[in-house]
From Swiss-Prot:
Its main location: cytoplasm. This is Small ribosomal subunit protein eS1. The gene is RPS1. It is found in: Cytoplasm. InterPro entries: Ribosomal_eS1 (IPR001593), Ribosomal_eS1_CS (IPR018281), Ribosomal_eS1_euk (IPR027500). It comes from Phaeosphaeria nodorum (strain SN15 / ATCC MYA-4574 / FGSC 10173) (Glume blotch fungus).
Length: 255
């Protein structure tokens, strides 16, 4: 009887690497939104722990998070707008972010476009008072005049140009006269959109006027004090203030 190898009996494999949990080398950090929003806690993010020359803070800085404005404002009416937040500073386990951009969801944009009306768009590059260079995109649609019988609401080319000019003027005026934080406060309640709608009534009535997108083109040199001010923190030294007191000479009783 020939004695051969039993293939069913497999020998134990040597030199197998021990499986390591990749999450054991990572840490969770809290993402904090600026004070211009109602809800400050955006969520958490993972990063590799600091080892050797690789610093966790350097890996976190520059990360961009896209968050629904409905979550930041606790209001479902803002669900179609997305805000981009960029990590500029890491303090302890908190990532301090700043406004990086705004956009509409694609389903909202598609729902606005309809037949029998004119779509009017405009964009402009503006610089805020704190030297942030932004590109703002506005969108609006013509609507039926009161007591109009005609089915369509098409605007003439001259009217479109006049409306576009108004859009550019209002966006430039409102954005160039305030800081980035103040502009964010204008964008949340859609102040600019309502202003455009009101000022163009004499040219052609508009509806669904929005600043649909804000793109950050260039940011100024990083200022830690300004960022901490946005997050309601202070970069000042907490050593205390000097208190002036009147000097009183102590009189020793003779023994």
């Amino acid at each position: 009887m020939a004695v051969g190898k039993n293939k069913r009996l497999s020998k134990g494999k040597k030199g197998l690497k021990k499986k390591t949990d990749t999450f054991a080398k990572k840490d969770w950090y809290n993402v904090k939104a600026p004070g211009t929003f109602a809800i400050r806690d955006v969520g958490k993010t993972l990063v590799n722990r600091t080892t050797g020359l690789k610093n966790a803070n350097d890996a976190l800085k520059g990360r961009i998070f896209e968050v629904s404005l409905a979550d930041l404002q606790k209001d479902e009416d803002h669900a179609f707008r997305k805000v981009k937040l960029r990590v500029d500073e890491v303090q302890g386990k908190n990532c301090l972010t700043n406004f990086h951009g705004l956009d509409f969801t694609s389903d909202k944009l598609r729902s606005l476009v309809r037949k029998w009306q004119t779509l009017i768009e405009a964009n402009v590059v503006v610089k805020t008072t704190d030297d942030y260079l932004l590109r703002l995109f506005a969108i609006g649609f013509t609507k039926r005049r009161p007591n109009q019988i005609k089915k369509t609401t098409y605007a003439a080319s001259s009217q479109i140009r006049a409306i576009r000019k108004k859009m550019v003027e209002i966006m430039t005026r409102d954005a160039s006269s305030c800081t980035l934080a103040q502009l964010t406060q204008k964008l949340i309640p859609e102040v600019i959109g309502r202003e455009i709608e009101k000022s163009t009534q004499g040219i052609y009535p508009l509806q669904n006027v929005h600043v649909r997108k804000v793109k950050l083109l260039k940011a100024p040199k990083f200022d830690l004090g300004a960022l901490l001010g946005l997050h309601g923190e202070s970069s000042a030294d907490d050593s205390g203030q000097k208190v002036e007191r009147e000097f009183k000479e102590t009189v020793l009783n003779e023994v």
